Amino acid sequence: MPAGRRGPAAQSARRPPPLLPLLLLLCVLGAPRAGSGAHTAVISPQDPTLLIGSSLLATCSVHGDPPGATAEGLYWTLNGRRLPPELSRVLNASTLALALANLNGSRQRSGDNLVCHARDGSILAGSCLYVGLPPEKPVNISCWSKNMKDLTCRWTPGAHGETFLHTNYSLKYKLRWYGQDNTCEEYHTVGPHSCHIPKDLALFTPYEIWVEATNRLGSARSDVLTLDILDVVTTDPPPDVHVSRVGGLEDQLSVRWVSPPALKDFLFQAKYQIRYRVEDSVDWKVVDDVSNQTSCRLAGLKPGTVYFVQVRCNPFGIYGSKKAGIWSEWSHPTAASTPRSERPGPGGGACEPRGGEPSSGPVRRELKQFLGWLKKHAYCSNLSFRLYDQWRAWMQKSHKTRNQDEGILPSGRRGTARGPAR
């Protein structure tokens, strides 16, 4: 039994005897009973169920007078390990008693094997010992419907969790105002505590859902969850996600996808999220403000870098539902790279302004500030990108105009203040 609480039953030899594989089957196939072997004996109580921390007084009584099977020659094993002789005492010539205190939880959900042996090691009788806790009421029930065709729910066993006993969980559901109780049948679909209802679900009518837990020491029932299928809809990840460059812009990528086809016949809205990361990183950056668009431009990216992009969908407002939907899984990653930068880096031979030329430092600083702010956000708003494109167009036009002016002026007067001719 696990060392959750210490007790004499936990003390035993370190190496189990060769009979262990056979003993592990006793509580599954049935422990030996009177008349099952050459030496007949009975263990009492038979297959007890006890709370953790309880004590047990068991006896092994030999029937008849088989040679070598007197009480003085008997001994006990628990899960294949011989128990210390000081835990036993002879009651009479044919009965050996065993006292175990402060029992730990069972090491096997099917019960621990308590076996009475003759002097030569043969098995006389066995009993299954169940030590654990009653179940607590299940909590944290959550459910979702894939494209309004089914319902999947999962839960957690309770605050304490482990009972050390086989505990059966049943998910029950019914229409709120009428109908009979139904029991979910497809368990463990998305984890150990989950169940899937594949069909025959009603829309526009609330359901009541709860979970019942039962084991040898008792039962518990969760609180009732009331939900409408339309309020817990999720869907498949957006298909056909495409990521491409935005012309020669070295810090941007364009992302496009299509709406979930499974919901094309239903009146609903959708919210989308995008996340992206660089090729050699595991950290994702999430873009939340995509709203109901099916395209987005990521900005503030690193030039000459491979990015992985994923998209997911949250359908909401189906048939007028007021509640937010449930996010789908992320789409499969799609990769694309930004163009390499053609601008020289620090110390890379950038031309400094010639003496007397007007410096474009203030404009460059302002642009740098704008781009620095943009890199902190990945905007998917068309207005934001129109503004950004206008900014770039204005800079190019301003630069071109300045170059034309400088080409008209005589070389001696370039960069000087313009004023009325004297």
UniProtKB/Swiss-Prot annotation:
PROSITE patterns: FN3. InterPro entries: FN3_dom (IPR003961), FN3_sf (IPR036116), Growth/epo_recpt_lig-bind (IPR015152), Ig-like_dom_sf (IPR036179), Ig-like_fold (IPR013783), Type-I_Cytokine_Rcpt (IPR050379). Disulfide bonds join 143-153, 184-195. CDD domains: FN3. Residues 137-232, 237-341 form the Fibronectin type-III domain. GO terms for cellular component: CRLF-CLCF1 complex; cytosol; external side of plasma membrane; extracellular region; extracellular space; receptor complex. Gene3D superfamilies: Immunoglobulins. Highest levels of expression observed in spleen, thymus, lymph node, appendix, bone marrow, stomach, placenta, heart, thyroid and ovary. Strongly expressed also in fetal lung. The modification Phosphoserine is found at residue 219. Glycans are attached at residues 92, 104, 140, 168, 292, 382. Residues 332-363, 399-422 are annotated as: Disordered. The keyword Coiled coil does not apply. Forms covalent di- and tetramers. Forms a heteromeric complex with cardiotrophin-like cytokine CLCF1/CLC; the CRLF1-CLCF1 complex is a ligand for the ciliary neurotrophic factor receptor/CNTFR. The CRLF1-CLCF1 heterodimer binds SORL1 (via N-terminal ectodomain); within this complex, the interaction is mediated predominantly by the CRLF1 moiety. The tripartite signaling complex formed by CRLF1, CLCF1 and CNTFR also binds SORL1. It is linked to Crisponi/Cold-induced sweating syndrome 1: An autosomal recessive disorder characterized by profuse sweating induced by cool surroundings (temperatures of 7 to 18 degrees Celsius). Patients manifest, in the neonatal period, orofacial weakness with impaired sucking and swallowing, resulting in poor feeding. Affected infants show a tendency to startle, with contractions of the facial muscles in response to tactile stimuli or during crying, trismus, abundant salivation, and opisthotonus. These features are referred to as Crisponi syndrome and can result in early death in infancy. This is Cytokine receptor-like factor 1.
